[in-house]
A protein has these predicted regions:
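Hydrophobic/aromatic beta-strand elements that line small-molecule binding cavities or substrate pockets
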Residues: 95, 109-114, 128-130, 145-151
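A solvent-exposed, acidic/Ser-Thr-rich amphipathic alpha-helical stretch
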Residues: 45, 63-117, 141
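A short, structured loop/turn motif at beta-sheet edges
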Residues: 114-122, 150-156
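Short, cysteine-centered beta-strand-loop-beta hairpins and adjacent loop/turn segments enriched
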Residues: 102, 130-140, 168
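A short hydrophobic beta-strand element
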Residues: 120-130
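N-terminal secretory signal peptides that target proteins for export/translocation
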Residues: 1-19
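Short beta-strand edge/turn micro-motifs at domain boundaries
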Residues: 143-170
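Short, low-complexity N-terminal intrinsically disordered segments enriched in polar/charged residues
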Residues: 28-69, 73, 170
Length: 170
């Protein structure tokens, strides 16, 4: 094996040189890993803020604000009461109908879990109480496990799918 210019012929320098290279590589990986943590935390904060705006828009029955938070795509998917609603426009039509009655979301912030699937895709999970009632009918509260997938677009994070799973009565 060829020795580096600063290595001794007896191998001691070779050992030190290899150790130094391994140590440098390890340190570089450590710093790289530390640098990605703030980026992940920043993305999670952006996703959390988008979810908070989604809840506020829902509770205000602000269809324009909801529209701006949904992915504008025919591939947007919302599964409600076992029925898939495909597409941005169909979802807005359904939300508009629900807003005629009682429609309120009360998330349980302590249960919020955001999983970054990739740089531009996040999964949101949170227990949430839905208060729902058709026009002229008494509203009922139901606990759901809300699942959403958000994607990052040029305009920011957008909800690309919504899957609320009802929690069975205990």
């Amino acid at each position: 094996m060829k020795a580096w210019p600063n290595e001794k012929k007896n191998g001691t320098g070779l050992y030190r040189s290899r150790f130094a290279r391994i140590l440098i590589a390890y340190m570089a990986l450590m710093f790289l890993s530390l640098a990605t943590k703030p980026a992940i935390a920043a993305a999670e904060d952006e996703v959390r803020a988008t979810f908070d705006r989604f809840v506020a828009a829902q509770n205000a029955h602000d269809i324009k604000a909801v529209e701006s938070l949904l992915l504008s795509s025919p591939d947007f998917l919302w599964i409600t009461r076992g029925t898939p609603i495909w597409g941005h426009d169909a979802a807005l039509k359904r939300f508009t109908a629900l807003y005629d009655g009682t429609w309120r979301l009360d998330p349980e912030p302590s249960g919020l879990k955001i999983t970054m699937i990739s740089d531009g895709v996040a999964q949101v999970y949170i227990p949430i109480i839905f208060t729902i009632g058709a026009t002229g009918q008494a509203a009922q509260q139901t606990k759901f496990l809300m699942n959403q997938v958000l994607v990052k677009t040029a305009d920011g994070w957008r909800v690309s799918s919504i899957l609320p799973i009802p929690v069975p009565p205990q």
